[in-house]
UniProtKB/Swiss-Prot annotation:
InterPro entries: DAD/Ost2. Pathway: Protein modification; protein glycosylation. It comes from the Eukaryota. Component of the oligosaccharyltransferase (OST) complex. The lineage of its organism: Eukaryota, Viridiplantae, Streptophyta, Embryophyta, Tracheophyta. It is found in: Endoplasmic reticulum membrane. Residues 1-30, 76-93 are cytoplasmic. The chain crosses the membrane at residues 31-51, 55-75, 94-114. Belongs to the DAD/OST2 family. One of its GO terms (biological process) is protein N-linked glycosylation. This is Dolichyl-diphosphooligosaccharide--protein glycosyltransferase subunit DAD2. It holds the Pfam family DAD.
Length: 114
C-alpha cells in the first residue's frame, strides 16, 4: 500500500475516533449544518438544470440555507464545552442568540423576496 493511502486511512481513523467522543448535542448541530448546506447544493443543482427565472427567489433560498448553516456553526462554537472562549456563556443564551439571529436573517430574506 502506498504511503499516502496509509496516511489517509490513518487520518480518517483518527477523525472517526475523535468524533465518536463528541457529545450528542454537537452531533445534532452538525447534522443540522450538513442538511442546510445540502439544501443549498440541491438548489444550485436545480438552478443549473431548470434555470433561474425568478433569480431573486433562487438567491434568497441559497442565502437562507448558507446563512442558516453559518449560524448553526456559530451555535456549535458557543455550545461546545471544550471552547474556552465561551465557557461563561450558558447554552440557553447561545440558543436564544441563534433563534434571534435566524429570525433577523429570515426577515431580511423575506424582504429581499419582495
Amino acid at each position: 500500500m502506498p504511503k499516502a493511502a496509509g496516511d489517509a486511512k490513518l487520518l480518517i481513523q483518527s477523525l472517526n475516533k475523535a468524533y465518536a467522543a463528541t457529545p450528542t448535542n454537537l452531533k445534532i448541530i452538525d447534522l443540522y449544518v450538513v442538511f442546510a448546506v445540502a439544501t443549498a447544493l440541491v438548489q444550485v443543482v436545480y438552478m443549473g438544470i431548470v434555470g433561474s427565472f425568478p433569480f431573486n427567489s433562487f438567491l434568497s433560498g441559497v442565502l437562507s440555507s448558507i446563512g442558516t448553516a453559518v449560524l448553526g456553526v456559530c451555535l456549535r462554537i458557543q455550545v461546545n464545552k471544550d471552547n474556552k472562549e465561551f465557557k461563561d456563556l450558558p447554552p440557553e443564551r447561545a440558543f436564544a442568540d441563534f433563534v434571534l439571529c435566524n429570525l433577523v436573517l429570515h426577515l431580511v430574506i423575506m424582504n429581499f423576496l419582495g
